[in-house]
Structure formats: structure tokens, C-alpha cells
Amino acid sequence: MAMLKRQPLFPHVIELNHQARRRVTGCSVYLIHDADNNWALIDIGYEDAVDELLEIIRQLDFPFSKCVTLIASHADVDHIQGFAKARQVLKTTVTCHPLAAKPLESGDKLATYAEITAQDIHLDMPPVKVEKLVDDGDRIRVGRLELEVWHTPGHTNGQLSFRLRNLLFSGDNLFRDGCVGAIDAHHGSSIQSFIKSLKRIRASDVEWLLPSHGPVFRKDERLIDSTIARLETYLHMADFGTCAIDWPLMDQWERELVEGKMPE
């Protein structure tokens, strides 16, 4: 069968939806490789797309035997549902943050967003063994390449980003339109941690953000500043429940109760 021509976004970086010229699965799937075709994936997406993704990888002439590891940016079903199947086919390892390991290994449907009863979402979440735990400052070797691990919590408490040269595989921290990954207390979200992670990204000298959803984009400090400012307002809004740190209206109400203020 004819091989596919590789369509890298950057040297040694292929995004498989971009390679296919269409959305194949629920998230971006980054293939990082060295000159000797040692390779790794950051995320895999849904289980029903694994066969197609692996066929694309095969047609790109990356030997399955040279898959170093499967890396989870975080333990959300749209990122990692296919890990168990891919790991079995590739006979490789799974790498993630320690806080992401438990839901991955237990197949926790609630923690991974596979089960959202109120919205009638009921997805399978096959458990998968995690062999490698990494945290901030660690390195993941992919043949001759090396990814620097950043712990960037906020969307989830176990979310990781990965630096390669001037690139940051940035997970669900920030998207090109200024949106961020869902904020949900049940999910381990923290607005304060989100802000800290975004400030770290802003202060860094990375040039490109490679998010887990949507197009790759050049780091824009004004966009990050605007997003941080928005998140800072979330800290004081009842809309975000226990993810907020206070609700100023309650202080105002206390004062008005003491004053005996009548409705206006």
C-alpha cells in the first residue's frame, strides 16, 4: 500500500487530524518523532477512532515497534478513551501525571467526564495501566528528542503541558479564541491554578501553543492577558460555585441587613 506524505506542523511534529485534513477524533493527537522514527503520541482521542489513527501512523511509515509511549495531557475521556486499545496494539507504555493515573487505571467514568447523567452522556472508559508517572520538571525522551514536562493544573488537577524547543503542547489551558478548558469543581478544576498556569505560559519564551482542541497558534500575550482578566472575575462570581473564592454580593447583603435597607 502506498505511503502517505508526512505533513508536519513543525519539524518532528505531526498532528493527525491535520494530517488527515479533517477531524478524526475528539482532540488533537500529536505525534512527536526523531530522525530515527522513534515516536510518541500526546493523547489519542476516542476509542472508535483508534484503528483509523493507527492506520494513518502506519501509512506515514512509523513502525509500531518504535512507539516509545502514549502520553496523557490529562485524564478526560475525549483525550484518553482509546489508550487501552492503542496500548494493546502498540505494546507500549502509558505516561501521565500522578493525579491522572488513578482515573486512567480505574476507568473512573465520573472523573473522566465519561458519565454526565444530567446530559444523558454515558460513554465507556476502558481502564488502562499506567507505567510512567511524570511531574513538573521531568523529561520524556523520544529517541533523540526530549520533552520538558510542565504541570499546568486548572482545567484538571493533573493536567500537563510539554515543551519541545519553542513549542508548548498546551493541553486545555488556552485555545485560539481565548476560551479555556471547562471549569468544574467535580472535575478537579481550580480557577486560581488556571490563572497561575496561564501566567507561567505568558512569562515563558515559547513561541507556539499547540492546544488539545482547535488550531495551533502563535503565543499572544494580549490574548493571555485578556483570558487571565476574565478568569479573575470568575473568582468572585456565583456562576462558578465552589470554584469561586467569594461572592461580594453576600457581603453587600450582610451590610444591608444590618442597615435595615429596604428594596429600591
Please place each PLM-identified region on the residue numbering.
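Conserved beta-strand hairpin/beta-sheet module of binuclear metal-dependent hydrolase folds
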Residues: 4-60, 161-171
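Short Pro/Gly-enriched beta-strand edge/turn motifs at strand-loop
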Residues: 9-17, 117-122, 144
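Divalent metal-coordination and catalytic microenvironments
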Residues: 12, 32, 43, 53, ...
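Residue-level marker for buried hydrophobic side chains located in beta-strands
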Residues: 40-42, 71, 94, 169-170, ...
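Metallo-beta-lactamase
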Residues: 46-48, 139, 146-226, 230-237
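Active-site HxH/HxHxD metal-binding segment of metal-dependent hydrolases
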Residues: 46-51, 58-139, 229, 233-237
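C-terminal regulatory/interaction regions
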Residues: 240-264
